[in-house]
């Protein structure tokens, strides 16, 4: 396969000196070394099939040798093969041409080969916006998902982390957010699939096509079957496309990264292959630097923004692991998906007591929103504290006040669940968008005890209070 990079050469060429898996040492003529991060290309014949492999310069070793990381499997690559310098870093297509299409980390279109090669391309290695260009205003991003809008509100132009172990709903929540942003705001989204399953990528593409939101989304994939160099760079490729929409087309953009842990994991693999001494728990010593270079580019500039939603796999549900811990430092809001809540059949399985947002304060969200959120959290916290007593002595031993608190907490817990648009075909129930003011009013009324007479099952996975009342009427008719 010929890549866009293979067609742009500087005339500088060298020879492969050593191949160790995805790491390739290349010898160049004296005084003619390519710059760090430059893309190199080498032609390979494997079983009578010609292909071009792209390498990225990672180190200058001395003696006119550079060490590069391959962006494709190195099968068929031999010592002595000619390597050409493109004279610039890996670049990807930008602009409206990328919408509705799938790309790899090198900017090659996978669903329509050749697309975007003739248009504008940007290097994936870019500097973050200057300090005087940053937006100082803080604004809430309304999602229509009750538990998020009320208890862990997202910042427009902020960075949001979705934490959780395997199988608790991170990818489903990301798909739902893409759908909602396209439907409610007609916004542009960029999805970067970092080291996840190829099946999930295919499912996402087909679902988005089916739901009519694909034309507003660019997809960039570097999946788990690809070399670590690709998985380390694909997030930067997606971010570069998003930066163009923000800086040139002046749009508000949503950047989805699934999964940011795989970015750290790929960096660890590359670091080991390059011979660096590992740091804590075997991670690369440059983990904080690499994460910072990516995260500092995700920000709001004057009048426009990139809001990033990042799924974070937590290895063995251990939040002290260096990879998720490093991500924490950059986030404006964290949404923790909890296996114990998912086991109750409540989706999204957001843990309201451990999820956080830096903007949940009266000066930003308003006094009423803040007070209702605090009342909800206090009721849920009190319920959690009473669980040990209930487990040992039963509900009958609680005071009347505590009994009311526990019953309200159960209703709140179930009402925090919600039907998703992307889950309609699985649940058979239509998705729901609940405006923020309706969410605040609904939880205020539940906390006030207006719905204490309603059975708990009336609150399961519904939208607003209208749905609850309709469900209650159905039960009465039966």
From Swiss-Prot:
GO terms for molecular function: ATP binding; ATP hydrolysis activity; proton-transporting ATP synthase activity, rotational mechanism. Its EC number is 7.1.2.2. It is a peripheral membrane protein. One of its GO terms (cellular component) is proton-transporting ATP synthase complex. ATP binds at residues 164-171. Keywords: ATP synthesis, ATP-binding, Cell membrane, CF(1), Hydrogen ion transport, Ion transport, Membrane, Nucleotide-binding, Translocase, Transport. It catalyses: ATP + H2O + 4 H(+)(in) = ADP + phosphate + 5 H(+)(out). It comes from the Bacteria. It holds the Pfam family ATP-synt_ab_N. It is found in: Cell membrane. F-type ATPases have 2 components, CF(1) - the catalytic core - and CF(0) - the membrane proton channel. CF(1) has five subunits: alpha(3), beta(3), gamma(1), delta(1), epsilon(1). CF(0) has three main subunits: a(1), b(2) and c(9-12). The alpha and beta chains form an alternating ring which encloses part of the gamma chain. CF(1) is attached to CF(0) by a central stalk formed by the gamma and epsilon chains, while a peripheral stalk is formed by the delta and b chains. Produces ATP from ADP in the presence of a proton gradient across the membrane. The catalytic sites are hosted primarily by the beta subunits. Belongs to the ATPase alpha/beta chains family. This is ATP synthase subunit beta.
